[in-house]
Amino acid sequence: MFLSRSIPQAFSLRYTTRYGKLILRPGRRFVSSEIQQKDEQAGESNTATDTGIIHKTEQETLIYFDNVYPRAMSLWSPTQWYNLLMSNQTRNAVRAKIFKFANPPDNPIHNLELRSTIPIKRDGGVFATFLVPPNYTTAEVNAMIQKNTQQESSKSWFSFFTEVTAFPVKGSPWIEDLRRLPSNQIRVKFEGGFLTEEEVYALFRRYGTIINIYPNPKEMTYLISYRSFRGAICAKNCVSGMEVHNSIIHVQYEQLTQGHVISDFFVNHTRIAVPLLLALLSILAVIVFDPIREFTIEQKITHKYSLSWDNYFLKKILSVTSSTMSSVKEYWGITDRHVQKRQLWEERQEKVADLKLWLQENNNTFVVLRGPRGSGKHELVMQHTLHDRPNVLYLDCDKLIKSRTDAKFLRNAASQLGYFPIFPWVNSVTNLLDLAVQGLTGQKSGLSESKELQFRNMLSTAMMSIRHIALKGYKPVIGSGDSIINVKEEDYLQQHPEKKPVIVIDRFNNRAEMNGFVYKELSDWAAMLVQMNLAHVIFLTETVSPNQLLAESLPNQVFKMMTLSDASKKSARRYVLAQLQETTEDDDDIDTSKPLDLNEKFVHEIDDSLDPIGGRMLDLQAFVRRVKSGEQPKEALEKMVEQASEQITQIFLSGSADPLRGAQAWELIELLSANGSIRFRDIIYRPLFKAAPEAALLDLEKNGFVTMTRDRGVLTDIYPAKPLFCAAFQYLLNNKEMYNVLRTSYLLRMVTFETGRIKKWEEELRALGKVSDQKMFRSRLAYLAGKIDASSAAIDDCESEVKELSKK
């Protein structure tokens, strides 16, 4: 039995001299036989898989076949999965393949026997042990196997990639599964004498083209660089362990120590690398995420795949079903007991008709719908005008404006637009990276984006989605045969206004304490949509102030203006009675066990209740709900007045409110409760309003306390924000206990206000008292003294009134 040699474990040293030099000649002791004996004594396996050593007899020959498996170029090479997926890579299939290459029918080696195969999948090859037939020598068998393998593997059309080569193994190969990946360079170590470069070339050239040989006499090694991986792999597996001139050759792959090119580039060229990385990330984001975002925005507008009643296909089914049932009922003379719930008074019906007509005209559909808070602008547009339209996008500015953090703002904006996916946390990370890059390079990377820019990008993506929806059925060419008509996109949109989406922007204003840029961005975006004729845009606003902002975004254009006012008493009465006459079976929160009896007395009570309620849409709807739930009209009115008064006290008269604004609100309550309206010129001379009357009133109007009329931009009259507030003002004044508390709070605020004024004047008097010539400021001193006397008298009056109120 021939046992291949393993790595020497011990050396016995002998010393000789030659030409005056000391030469070390190691006396070698092989350890493989001892290891084999130990394994046999322990009853362990001696296979090549367990020991890394291939055993063969003198009657056997060992051949290495290359390019049988896909070789591993890295630790995570995906080509290795090919061995698991393909059936022709199994052990039996490989044995049959190798035997076919070595012993083909057209040039057989008689009585050739394949004893064993040992796959080396990392190197892509197989060690095969053949039994040499008696009529052949080992050299003859090796030569024939090499020739047959070369001829058989080259018959395939893909032989350039799949050709297999066979080489006799001259050494004692070491079968290891260490993490030493193949490379095109091998390190040859000599245990004993050092071969010449010519001898090394002659020994290793047969396995592949050698690019260069790098000798290292000090370490007794050669570095051989092959042109291909195959040459280095075959040389390593066939020559390693070979003995030449009493020198044992050890061959290992040389691991190429390549520098980290990418990391070095980033470290050494940050000013170029960082912008380049940002550009690549931006391109990747556009390629991957923008199509997804455009699709989600289209879904938000059309509801085509949404799981709701707005689903496109569900609407089609319901439309067909409803039409069919209506036809059947009409044929049998059956009428619906349910009255259509979309009740409007005549003025509102005309508004709805005008809006629908403007959307059909397709001529600069830029509508501004103005009305006080609670006038029903949202209901008029969304429920009565656009309820049957399949492509509507609703944006609520209030949710965007009130977002306190950048991440919350971006999430709210994305939610309203249907912009998905979005990564708000990236903004915080990029800010930190921007600071780090600025510290390294001295300049900003431009990685971080402001929320204004991100919001603008969202709107740009939404514009692309809107364009896709508007041009869904567009065909550039119409006709067949000789009659072909080219149709432009502009002409198609002009002829099909129903294809264009409707953008509804609610609670639009022109300024805000935070996130005020939203109004400007939405205004510019809407103007661009209208100019490109891609969509109809409807703005819902409470005041006339946004008109200037819209005019800046869309100059030289006349807006379609529509104003919603409170209903007249006649229209409000008709609306309420029509609502009360409806069957309430579909209302889950209303008790229908007690049907309403609309007798003359009941109608008279409703008429009396509608006087203080007025014609505000939301108040009328609240009144109807209360009456339907079982409350009497008078009781419903009282509760609504109490609720309105509570709202006023909590927002404007509570301790958390601004003291000055609270005092101004109470003064207006007393004036408006007596007259119903007051002129602006009667307010500007009052002490609380004298400093900035218009700013104070605008702030109260913004918070929904009062509403004002203007004549050519100048304030003229002041009214309560809604008619119900008049009754609430009267309630606050007539309730003695509440009146005493609120009046006392107002008087104390007046005392504080007048005291602050006196302190300011006293400081001026103190400064004037230091002047030597008092005659120069005699008139100013008299003026200040008069002011102080007047304020002191006002304080005395307030304090005396507080005492009187405390006694009640």
UniProtKB/Swiss-Prot annotation:
Membrane-spanning intervals of the chain: 272-292
Organism superkingdom: Eukaryota
GO biological process: mitochondrial genome maintenance; mRNA processing
UniProt entry keywords in alphabetical sequence: Membrane, Mitochondrion, Mitochondrion inner membrane, mRNA processing, RNA-binding, Transit peptide, Transmembrane, Transmembrane helix
Domain RRM intervals: 184-256
Membrane topology: Single-pass membrane protein
GO CC entries: mitochondrial inner membrane
Segments on the Mitochondrial intermembrane side according to the record's topology features: 293-808
Location in the cell: Mitochondrion inner membrane
Entry annotated with the keyword Membrane: yes
A GO molecular function held by the record: RNA binding
Mitochondrial matrix-side positions: 31-271
Pfam families cross-referenced by the UniProt entry: RNA12 (PF10443)
Residue span of the annotated presequence: 1-30
Role noted for this protein: Plays a role in maintaining the mitochondrial genome and in controlling the mtDNA escape. Involved in the regulation of mtDNA nucleotide structure and number. May have a dispensable role in early maturation of pre-rRNA.
PANTHER family in the record: MITOCHONDRIAL ESCAPE PROTEIN 2
The family this protein is said to belong to: Belongs to the YME2 family.
Name of this chain's protein: Mitochondrial escape protein 2
Protein encoded by which gene: YME2
